[in-house]
Amino acid sequence: NIGCITGVYNISASYVLVEGVFSNTQNVSPYRGAGRPEATYIIERMIDIAAEKLGFDKVELRRRNLIRPEQMPFKTGLVFTYDSGDFPGLLITALNAANWAGFDDRRMASKSRSRIRGFGIANPIEIAGGPERKPHSEFARVTVSPDGSVVLVSGSSDSGQGHATVFAQILSSKLGVDPTAVSLIAGDTREAPNGTGTFGSRTVAAAGTSIVKCAEILIKTMQEPAAEVLESTIDEISFEDGYYRVQKSNLSISFIDL
C-alpha cells in the first residue's frame, strides 16, 4: 500500500519514512487499515500544504503534476507501474460534476447564512482485481433448469455491493436470458466449496470473468443439441443474442427454448 503514496502524480523517485502511531482516540473517526486511503491522504495533504505555502491554486497545482496519458505505462518511484489512465481528463470530469467553477458563489451564499463551506479534492488510485501481480481466482457455477431458469452459484458474497444485479446482467448479456430469470446463491459453503471473497475492487474482474467462462462453456456444450434440433452440423451453428442459428439460413432456436 505504500506504493500508492506518490498517487497519480509525476513523481519518478521518492524517499519515504513512515512512522505509525497506535491510538484509541482518533481525532476524526476510526477507519480500518485499508492502506490506500491513508497513502492518498498523505500525498493529497502535502499538495494542499504546498499550494497554501506557494500561494498557488490547489487544483492547478494538481493538474500540472498529474501523470499524462502519453506517459503510460508509467513506473512510479514506489512499487507500481500504471498501465493506463487519463488522470487529467478524470480531474476535469470530477470538477465539472462538482461545479467547481460555481464554488465561490456557493461559499458566499453559505457565509450569508453564517455557514462555512469547504471544498476538498483528492485523486485516489486503487488496485483493481488484485492482489497486484497475482490476482486470486474466484468460484462460479451456472446451471439451467428445464423451465429456463438460471441458477448461479458464486464464491464471492455480497455485502451491499449489488452482486445479484451485476451477475444477472453478465449472464443475461452472454446467454440472452432475461435478468429476472437468474437467481444467485452465495455464502453457502455446501453449494460453493471455495471462494476468495469481496474486497479490493476485484469482484467484477475475478468473479465476473468466472461467470463469463461458465457461460461460454455452457453455450459450447449446448451447440450439439442445438445442431440436432435444427437438423444441422455443429460447424454450421453459431450463437448470437441468445439464439443458436444455422448459418446462411433462417433456422434458429433460443437458448431458453433449447
Language-model segments: which ranges?
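Helix-loop-helix junctions that connect adjacent transmembrane helices in secondary transporters/permeases
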Residues: 66-149, 169
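Long hydrophobic segments that form regular secondary structure
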Residues: 30-72, 144-150, 162, 170-181, ...
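Glycine-rich loop/linker segments at domain edges
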Residues: 1-46, 127-137, 205, 253-255
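Glycine-rich and small/hydrophobic secondary-structure elements
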Residues: 28-53, 74-99, 195-229, 250-258
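C-terminal, non-catalytic interaction/recognition modules in large multi-subunit enzymes and RNPs
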Residues: 141-151, 234-258
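Catalytic phosphate/nucleotide-handling subdomain of diverse soluble enzymes
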Residues: 128-192, 197-202, 206-211, 215-219
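Beta-strand segments within the central parallel beta-sheet cores of soluble alpha/beta enzyme folds
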Residues: 58-67, 105-121, 153-155, 179-188, ...
